[in-house]
Amino acid sequence: MLDPKILRQNLEHVVEKLRRRGFEMDSDTFLQLENKRKEAQLAIQSFQTKRNQLSKTIGMAKSKGENPELLMAEVSQLNDELKQEEANFETIQKAFSDFQLAIPNLPHDSVPDGKSENDNREIRQWGAPPGFDFTPKDHTVLGERDNQLDFEAAAKLSGARFVVLRGSLARAHRALAQFMLDLHTDQHGYEEVYVPYLVHEECLYGTGQLPKFREEQFQVAGDRNFFLVPTGEVPLVNLARDEIIEAPALPKKWVAQTPCFRSEAGSYGKDVRGMIRQHQFQKVELVQLVQPENSYQALEEITRQAEKVLQLLALPYRVVELCAGDLGFAAAKTYDLEVWLPSQNKYREISSCSNCEDFQARRIQARWRNPKTGKPELLHTLNGSGLAVGRTLVAVMENYQQADGHIRVPDALKSYMGGVDYF
């Protein structure tokens, strides 16, 4: 959520920055709501002033032995009118809040202009795509051996965009997740956290998935108002809801492995085959809570930490900076990591690392105590995939494939795979 003060004091500036990301803010509606809010506030203050004056007059009348009955009736009438005006103010505040919740974050000044992923800017590449003396196979073909990658069984259980992993592929999937967790906890200083996979609606409002992306969420039937987590970012960031963290305890660095559930409502016809785009997938998520002045340094750090996974697995990748029009709803700046997939002869997204500044923190009131002032101030929140486990498995399968269809185990993964060289 944007700072209401910025909206009120620099509306034209906000409108222009939002226009960079392709969002047209209805400034007329904002001004109408703001005027109604001010009018209602003034009316409430006026009623309160009159009531206070009458209360004093009643007190004086009683002290003189006069009958204050008429004055008390007037106070009663004022109280009724005040309640009505307060209810009106609450309605206006709700409309104002709903309006604010629909506004995305402002892009950082360093974010390049652009409308779509075609306008994203490549920052760097790492590693060279492997050369094969045979035509490389798609991961779905590689997974046919011993039926280790079974989409038919998954369809029988759950429908399209699910997978059943068996044998060595299931073990490799587990090994990758464990490898990522060990790296981030042992070398990058993250605290591992186990979180619920069902969260309340307010958590999704807190991180920005709601209200805009409701159709992309899986909501649990019944009266409990539960949603399946679309990413580990949701429960991790919401751990700081309504908290005030002392400065010496910062930064908070949390990592969790969770399943992620997404309806992919806007992805009809995209990546229909395979494990690239699924309703359920595992992801190792990194979250940092930092002092505002440190957040862009933290963004570079979290991106390098996600890159380290790919480097240790010796998977070729590139880093791209998202243009303003391709930014996620809550992000002020984002780097995507894209891994090389030989069967597609191109890079595909495997991680997204974002600085949300105080956008999420304002929604959930996540604060730190500034020792200079002694007062609570909003934190900056960052998140990054470290990495998407299924897509990493796809990248390993395709980049390490052999002519006979077996997969060579990356050196960094061998200890997690029982020391085998191939699977």
From Swiss-Prot:
Enzyme Commission (EC) number: 6.1.1.11
Binding site for L-serine: T231, G232, E233, E285, S385
Residues binding ATP, per UniProt: R262, S263, E264, E349, I350, S351, S352
Subcellular localization: Cytoplasm
Biological processes, Gene Ontology terms: selenocysteine biosynthetic process; seryl-tRNA aminoacylation
A GO MF label: serine-tRNA ligase activity
Keywords: Aminoacyl-tRNA synthetase, ATP-binding, Cytoplasm, Ligase, Nucleotide-binding, Protein biosynthesis
Any single Pfam family the record assigns to this protein: Seryl_tRNA_N
Pathway as given in its UniProt record: Aminoacyl-tRNA biosynthesis; selenocysteinyl-tRNA(Sec) biosynthesis; L-seryl-tRNA(Sec) from L-serine and tRNA(Sec): step 1/1
Keyword ATP-binding belongs to the record: yes
A cellular-component GO term for this protein: cytoplasm
Annotated catalysed reactions: tRNA(Ser) + L-serine + ATP = L-seryl-tRNA(Ser) + AMP + diphosphate + H(+); tRNA(Sec) + L-serine + ATP = L-seryl-tRNA(Sec) + AMP + diphosphate + H(+)
Gene3D superfamilies: Bira Bifunctional Protein, Domain 2, Serine-tRNA synthetase, tRNA binding domain
HAMAP family: Ser_tRNA_synth_type1 (MF_00176)
Assembly and binders: Homodimer. The tRNA molecule binds across the dimer.
Its biological purpose: Catalyzes the attachment of serine to tRNA(Ser). Is also able to aminoacylate tRNA(Sec) with serine, to form the misacylated tRNA L-seryl-tRNA(Sec), which will be further converted into selenocysteinyl-tRNA(Sec).
NCBIfam families, sorted: serS
Domain free text: Consists of two distinct domains, a catalytic core and a N-terminal extension that is involved in tRNA binding.
Entry's family note: Belongs to the class-II aminoacyl-tRNA synthetase family. Type-1 seryl-tRNA synthetase subfamily.
Name by which UniProt lists this protein: Serine--tRNA ligase
Gene (name only): serS
